[in-house]
Swiss-Prot record:
Native species: Rhodnius prolixus
GO molecular function, one term: metal ion binding
Disulfide bonds: 23-143, 62-192
Entry protein name: Nitrophorin-4
Catalytic activity: 3 nitrite + 2 H(+) = 2 nitric oxide + nitrate + H2O
């Protein structure tokens, strides 16, 4: 699903090419999910990811996110880096709580300083579910919607350490979701570059 993952990599907005894939209804949020630990303002790195149409997934993909609370609102800032072109992309979302561990993000594309490049567009949003999280790692499911149509499923393993390997607990969460970790694509060989200062500052924009 190249157009789906590429669309995420271009601030989750620009390269949609007509893909339609109903998202799973079986992404279950972690029981006892600790919102305060997950949304503490620190950076999560995407270390491994799985698109359910893997033949078209770009092999070189880097992403990170900061999730926190600003002015009483849950917010998420996403950063994407293309190691081939060295292009960087950012977007910022205010999150609507669907239930504990499940959120809808209405996003806007911004530059690193928070200046809006593409405003929030009705019908274009993503939903994500925190399927597992501890202090240092997480498994999330994301479904991107364009024109209120599902574009398909993307799973990502996150870590607070960009160089960390997935641990047994997060791998167990992958297995519990009836997924195979061996099918996830690692970002570790992608020569990823990150911009944590800008990413964290975008939570206040």
């Amino acid at each position: 699903m190249k157009s789906y993952t590429s669309l995420l990599a271009v601030a989750i907005l620009c390269l949609f090419g007509g893909v339609n894939g109903a998202c799973t209804k079986n992404a279950i949020a972690q029981t006892g999910f600790n919102k305060d630990k997950y949304f503490n303002g620190d950076v999560w790195y995407v270390t491994d990811y799985l698109d359910l149409e893997p033949d078209d997934v770009p092999k070189r993909y880097c992403a990170a996110l900061a999730a926190g609370t600003a002015s009483g609102k849950l917010k998420e800032a996403l950063y994407h880096y293309d190691p081939k072109t060295q292009d960087t992309f950012y977007d910022v979302s205010e999150l609507q709580v669907e239930s504990l561990g499940k959120y809808t993000a209405n996003f806007k594309k911004v530059d690193k300083n928070g200046n809006v490049k593409v405003a929030v567009t009705a019908g274009n949003y993503y939903t994500f579910t925190v399927m597992y999280a501890d202090d240092s790692s997480a498994l999330i499911h994301t479904c991107l919607h364009k024109g209120n149509k599902d574009l398909g499923d993307l799973y990502a393993v996150l870590n607070r350490n960009k160089d960390a390997a997935a641990g047994d607990k997060v791998k167990s969460a992958v297995s519990a979701a009836t997924l195979e970790f061996s099918k996830f694509i690692s970002t570790k060989e992608n020569n990823c570059a990150y911009d944590n200062d800008s990413l964290k500052s975008l939570l206040t924009k």
